[in-house]
């Protein structure tokens, strides 16, 4: 007989009551530890479509016109569970698309419509995205019908396009190609506030000084897409709001004319909802009970739909005909005097001092009822700010011009984070090249393997060092951002302003190398771009360094890069791509509040690197002597220019200890003699101190992995060089 005491039966096996939410995480226990999660997100294991699925290939089999027809039919197919205002869902779908794209910020390229992230926290539950869950549910039958051929990300933007077209606007076009993600993004910093819609000046405020908005943020409050429609911190003052608008839209890569067009065009159709008490609404989607099935803000206390809907708390339409594309917004805004009032939900808004009944929009359910139109504080800024007023009057006097500017601005808003035109898919892609798409000329030459070998030989015989070739190729490619697919080596914009003058590109060294490449180019019998020469030069240098380490390897090189011109380059829009740090070259422009290793992690994520790829690249770049300015920090080798695993061997060798010599400065000292052997920075030390990174470093330090280190470095190097070669994907 078993004498062990009987176990309790029928009880929850998890004494804390939850499998996923209880207990402290490693980050809770060690909040200052380097968190590598941003490099481990979007793993293929979380993608239900599998490793072999190609969205681009699937999209090319999509009947795009059939989708557009279905979307157009949906616009007026009102559902009882969420009825359409005036029988037309256009305003709702436009707001959904606007808010999907409008989270983009140019500083780091993150946010935006490119991933379908509105389906996940925190965006799906932001106060500013209230009731957009209903819009996505209305789209579900269409998504279900077309399946894998049409991503949620593409569908949401296309729905916004078709909403405008169904109401009379000729849109500029549509490009598909946005691939869905399958869980929330971990790399996007939305702010450090601890509550939604926190006013400036409190804990974790995104503002400092007079009203300096923290980089890289664009929105003025946690949980808003852009500005507070009631005014700065909820206090109406159109001129103050205008300043917020100008800053926010500039950080979304929009100028004043585009800003007015987007504001007016967004409010030409649809309405705001605040005819009720927000206290009657249930929790947001992430906090809602399981029976709500992912829907939030559900009103179980009052009717809560149709004319009784509460979303932003602001109530009313902006124009007389809210389901028709016309010039009614400017007619209403400019031809009436406005006074402050509060909506039934208690939100600040503006109403006309007087208005003719026939100019009032009708009720969303009963056309015999006329309703008072509204303007938000942001709308009033379009009238009261002098520059915005000039643009508004121009648009009012020329409706065709307004429609054209808006259509182009809407296309830019919804496609800015899709990247260069080479990534666009579908029959509705506009033929015109736009400067914000960072166009690059198509090359008209090919190179054989013999041609490539000849180029490598010429470059190695040019007198340029391994370090110079590696650093130049790296600097050209490192600007790539997987967030909005900008930057990279294609186009060789490192030759042009502003990149040629960036401090991080070491202008003197850069001009020397470019001069040599220009000489090689002029002496060739075949056409080759400088962009290709820069990359093949890096490949030649890496091959030589590998040979010197005893490993014969060919660095794959795919020709086909063009050389962009100044006319194809918007210098101002490239300013946010300027590196102010690069841990791969052991450089920071100045002392920042953020630790250098955190900045390295951020750059690696933007470049699309995994943690092992980041590790092997740093170790290789150090021994190649590719540090900024020839710095010796982290160069743990006596064989500079040789692609050895010495960085990892010496990093993990207990014969040495590390001693601080400054805030970001260390000496490596021999334990037995006290002799200083090498110098280092935090970016070097972190590969020995962080437990995860050390595990990778130990792999590359092993005696049996010297060749593996070289091969892994080459693979990661080629990934960086080809990151913007969308034609190779």
Swiss-Prot record:
The record marks 95 as: Transition state stabilizer. Its cofactor is heme b. GO terms for cellular component: cytosol. Its EC number is 1.11.1.21. Keywords: Heme, Hydrogen peroxide, Iron, Metal-binding, Oxidoreductase, Peroxidase. Formation of the three residue Trp-Tyr-Met cross-link is important for the catalase, but not the peroxidase activity of the enzyme. Homodimer or homotetramer. Bifunctional enzyme with both catalase and broad-spectrum peroxidase activity. This is Catalase-peroxidase 1. It comes from Cellvibrio japonicus (strain Ueda107) (Pseudomonas fluorescens subsp. cellulosa). The lineage of its organism: Bacteria, Pseudomonadati, Pseudomonadota, Gammaproteobacteria, Cellvibrionales. The gene is katG1.
């Amino acid at each position: 007989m078993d004498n062990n005491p009987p176990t309790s039966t029928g009880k929850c096996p998890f004494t804390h009551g939850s499998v996923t939410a209880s207990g402290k995480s490693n980050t809770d226990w060690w909040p200052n530890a380097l968190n590598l999660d941003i490099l481990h997100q979007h793993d293929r294991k979380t993608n239900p479509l599998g490793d072999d699925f190609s969205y681009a290939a699937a999209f090319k089999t999509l009947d795009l016109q059939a989708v557009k027809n279905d979307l157009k039919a949906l616009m007026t197919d009102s559902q009882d569970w969420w009825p359409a205002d005036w029988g037309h869902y256009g305003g709702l779908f436009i707001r959904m698309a606007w808010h999907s794209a409008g989270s983009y910020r140019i500083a780091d390229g993150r946010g935006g419509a490119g991933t379908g992230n509105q389906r996940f926290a925190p965006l799906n539950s932001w106060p500013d995205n209230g009731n957009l869950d209903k819009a996505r549910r209305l789209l579900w039958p269409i998504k279900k019908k077309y399946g894998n051929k049409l991503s949620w990300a593409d569908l949401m933007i296309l729905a916004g396009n078709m909403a405008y077209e169904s109401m009379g606007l000729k849109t500029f076009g549509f490009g598909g190609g946005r691939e869905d993600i399958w869980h929330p993004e971990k790399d996007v910093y939305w702010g450090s506030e601890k509550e939604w819609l926190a006013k400036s000046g409190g804990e974790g405020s995104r503002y400092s000084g007079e009203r300096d908005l923290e980089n890289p943020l664009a929105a003025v409050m946690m949980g808003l897409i852009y500005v507070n429609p009631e005014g700065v911190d909820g206090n109406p003052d159109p001129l103050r709001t205008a300043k917020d608008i100008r800053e926010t839209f500039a950080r979304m890569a929009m100028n004043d004319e585009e800003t007015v067009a987007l504001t007016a065009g967004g409010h030409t159709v649809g309405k705001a909802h605040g005819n009720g008490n927000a206290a009657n609404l249930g929790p947001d989607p992430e906090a809602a009970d399981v029976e709500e099935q992912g829907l939030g803000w559900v009103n179980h206390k009052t009717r809560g739909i149709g004319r009784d809907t509460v979303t932003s708390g602001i109530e009313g339409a902006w124009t007389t005909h809210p389901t028709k594309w016309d010039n009614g917004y400017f007619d209403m805004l400019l031809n009436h005097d406005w006074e402050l009032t509060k909506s039934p939900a208690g939100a600040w808004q503006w109403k006309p001092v007087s208005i003719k009944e026939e100019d009032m929009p009708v009720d969303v359910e009963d056309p015999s009822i006329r309703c008072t139109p509204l303007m938000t504080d942001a709308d009033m800024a379009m009238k009261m700010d002098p520059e915005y007023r000039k643009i508004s009057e121009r648009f009012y006097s020329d409706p065709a011009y307004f429609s054209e500017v808006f259509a182009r601005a809407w296309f830019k808003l919804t496609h800015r984070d899709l990247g260069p035109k080479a990534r666009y898919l579908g029959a509705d892609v506009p033929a015109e090249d736009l400067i914000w798409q960072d166009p690059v000329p198509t090359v008209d030459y090919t190179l054989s393997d013999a041609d490539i070998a000849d180029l490598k030989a010429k470059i190695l015989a040019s007198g340029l060092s391994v370090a110079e070739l590696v650093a130049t190729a790296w600097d050209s490619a490192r600007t790539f951002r997987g967030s909005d697919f900008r930057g990279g080596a294609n186009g060789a914009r490192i030759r042009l302003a502003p990149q040629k003058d960036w401090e991080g590109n070491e202008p003197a060294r850069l001009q020397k190398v470019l001069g040599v490449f220009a000489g090689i180019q002029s002496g060739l019998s075949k056409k080759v771009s400088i962009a290709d020469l820069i990359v093949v030069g890096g490949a030649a240098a890496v091959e030589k360094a590998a040979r010197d380490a005893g490993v014969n390897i060919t660095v794959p090189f795919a020709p086909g890069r063009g050389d962009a011109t100044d006319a194809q380059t918007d210098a101002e829009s490239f300013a946010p791509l300027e590196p102010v740090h690069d841990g791969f070259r052991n450089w920071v422009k100045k002392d920042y509040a953020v630790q250098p290793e955190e900045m390295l992690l951020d750059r690696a994520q933007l470049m699309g690197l995994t943690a092992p790829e980041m590790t092997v690249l740093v170790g290789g770049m150090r021994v190649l002597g590719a540090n900024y300015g020839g710095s010796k920090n982290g160069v743990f080798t006596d064989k500079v220019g040789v692609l050895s695993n010495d960085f990892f061997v010496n990093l993990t060798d207990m014969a040495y200890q590390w001693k601080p010599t400054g805030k970001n400065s260390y000496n490596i000292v021999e334990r037995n003699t006290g002799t200083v052997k090498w110098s280092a920075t935090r970016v070097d030390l972190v590969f020995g101190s962080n437990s995860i990174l050390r595990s990778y470093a130990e792999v590359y330090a092993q005696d049996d992995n010297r060749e593996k280190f070289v091969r892994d470095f080459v693979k990661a190097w080629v990934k960086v060089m080809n990151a913007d070669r969308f034609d190779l994907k």
